[in-house]
């Protein structure tokens, strides 16, 4: 079997496992989001970490995505601001609290926080700050990765908390320790990371299920259409005024 096929099979197996084990929680997450949308309230998605940020971008200003999604795109942990800088900031105690404060999350809001490892300081502090403010929290992370990471690892929050232990609803992404899944003969380090596929699948599944739940109540939530198709700009423009000024990065 060639390596591309091996990687393909790994990706498919991960997605199957998510479907088999996390469907109920994905439905619960969709219910939480649908309640926000029915009240015309935003829900926030934060991926504190270099590649975890991709998860928040996946649901934001995205064709087929809910317009009520507000991505927390803090420059501190974006790779475009410097990869090593991003890593150091996501390990900085207190930083996550500053980010939540900057987006002014408040009681009754909903935060989805995505981090494959679920241990770093920015992740844990963001959840702790959100909970202090009465914000509902959903976490997407690997329980296995967090549980197998030693307490003295430098990325860990001083509390030693794991994301999945402190959120209101935890969705287990099942990512193996180290993320990469493909072994190549003669190479010590594995290649072929998997977490971006899994995070995108989980988040888009939540979007789909949220929309389906709302449809059962005869509610049509505003959904982005690609600006690169005929009529896309016209479709989106009818909703922009509802969200401009509310969604920080719009």
Label for each model-derived stretch:
Residues 21-36:
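A short, well-structured juxtamembrane/interface segment
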Residues 48-201, 207:
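Glycine-rich phosphate-binding loops that contact phosphosugars or nucleotide phosphates
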Residues 1-20:
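Generic N-terminal amphipathic, Lys/Arg-enriched alpha-helix
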Residues 42-47:
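Short glycine-rich phosphate-binding loop at a beta-alpha junction
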Residues 8, 93-97, 121, 243-245, ...:
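Conserved, well-structured ligand/cofactor-binding cores
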């Amino acid at each position: 079997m060639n390596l591309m096929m091996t990687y393909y099979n790994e990706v498919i197996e991960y997605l199957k496992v998510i479907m088999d084990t996390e469907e109920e929680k994905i439905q619960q997450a969709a219910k939480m989001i649908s309640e926000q949308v029915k009240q015309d309230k935003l829900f926030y998605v934060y991926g504190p970490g270099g590649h975890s940020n991709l998860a928040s971008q996946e649901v934001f200003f995205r064709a087929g995505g809910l317009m009520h999604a507000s991505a927390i795109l803090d420059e501190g942990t974006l790779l475009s601001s410097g990869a090593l800088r991003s890593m150091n900031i996501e390990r900085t105690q207190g930083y996550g609290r500053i980010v939540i404060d900057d987006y002014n999350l408040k009681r009754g809001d909903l935060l989805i926080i995505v981090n494959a490892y679920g241990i770093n300081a920015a992740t844990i502090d963001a959840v702790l700050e959100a909970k202090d403010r009465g914000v509902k929290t959903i976490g997407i992370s690997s329980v296995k990765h967090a549980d197998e990471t030693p307490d003295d690892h430098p990325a860990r929050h001083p509390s030693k908390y794991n994301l999945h232990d402190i959120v209101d609803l935890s969705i287990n992404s099942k990512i193996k320790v180290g993320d990469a899944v493909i072994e190549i003969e003669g190479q010590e380090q594995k290649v072929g990371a998997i977490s971006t596929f899994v995070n995108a699948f989980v988040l888009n599944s939540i979007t789909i299920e949220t929309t389906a739940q709302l449809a059962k109540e005869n509610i049509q939530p505003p959904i982005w259409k690609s600006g690169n198709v005929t009529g896309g700009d016209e479709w989106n423009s009818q909703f922009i005024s509802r969200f401009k000024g509310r969604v920080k990065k719009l």
